[in-house]
Amino acid sequence: MKNVLLKRAAAVFAAGWLAVASAPAAHAAEPLPKLSVTVFAPPSQSIWIPALIQRAGLDRKHGFELVVTPKPSNVAYTDFATGRDPVCFCAAIAAVSRFKQQGGNFTLLWNIFNFESDIVLRDPAINDPKQLEGKVLQTDTITGSWALSKWFLQARGVDLGKVKIKSSSARGAAGLAELQLGRIDALLVNPTEGAAAVAQGKGALHALPVFDKAVWQKAAGTDFVPSITFGVANDWIAQKANQDLARRFYAANRDAAAFIRDNPAEAARLVAKDAQVDVAALQTVLERYRDLMRIEPLRKHIKTVALLTQKLLPEGGQLPRPLTDAELDSLVSNFDVEAAHE
């Protein structure tokens, strides 16, 4: 009888020990929370950081799994503005401000990219944007990049009434073909596309930067323009679990941006396939624009956003009217993304 009791006690102890020992393993096996984000389809620069986060495992480092969905710019903006996509990694201030005026239920958490764009040309004699007058310029006019480019071109003395603007959402090779065939005179694109086009042109193409630091410092008193931001639906960020996800994603963003600045060659190798850009061309962009990525809470720059949305963009015709103070406060989130995540 004694032996039977001892065996039963041993069995109970063993079962309890196994349960305790297996608990950490079971906990470790629990799936990570997923964060699904929309980006512009490649070769948009909005795919760089999410792709690097995935390739370098920075999402898992910060305790979540990132899912990236590339979409054409018009689809991405429509889905974000209507709430179909609650998370957008391609929310250009100049573009989504229009949606805010129309009652859009979203807010912007942090800046991702400063404004930069390039004008790619065949004619070597064109070395000043004013020489675009009388020419055909192709670009994607639905994007915030175009809205800011338009403001800079006008500020630099270009009469856009004398420039024929051809709008197209075609990216990469399609736009380059139009330029090489002589159907257009110039192509206004992001820095990645600009570098790729110049590289593929093998000496036949050159690029002019649109951003002018002196012009901007005179207008704003700062050295950069917040441009592409991380936007979320208000209902989404109101949920505690999503607040934690947003903070984890912000930390991963900061890590990715630091990696790109410190290791542009390796970053280009990791991201080029997703970005659909030649490794060498992408490396050139990352080295040329080391300060292009500026991951900071947008609320820190609300005065600059106010200047953009309440003065410069409306005066330039890129917004139908200035944002009201209430719209501005709603547009630029005061959610603390830098607080420690759980």
Briefly describe each language-model feature range.
Residues 1-6:
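N-terminal secretory signal peptides that target proteins for export/translocation
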Residues 23-28:
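Sec/Tat signal peptide C-region and signal peptidase I cleavage site
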Residues 61, 134, 211-223, 291-300:
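Short, solvent-exposed loop/beta-turn-alpha elements that line the ligand-binding surface or hinge
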Residues 10-21:
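Bacterial N-terminal signal peptides
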Residues 94, 174-177, 181-271:
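Pocket-lining segment of extracytoplasmic ligand-binding domains
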Residues 238-316:
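Secondary-structure end/capping motifs
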Residues 310-342:
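Conserved C-terminal helix/tail region of periplasmic/extracytoplasmic solute-binding proteins
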Residues 29-171, 178-181, 185-191, 202-211:
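Short, glycine-/small- and polar/acidic-enriched structural segments
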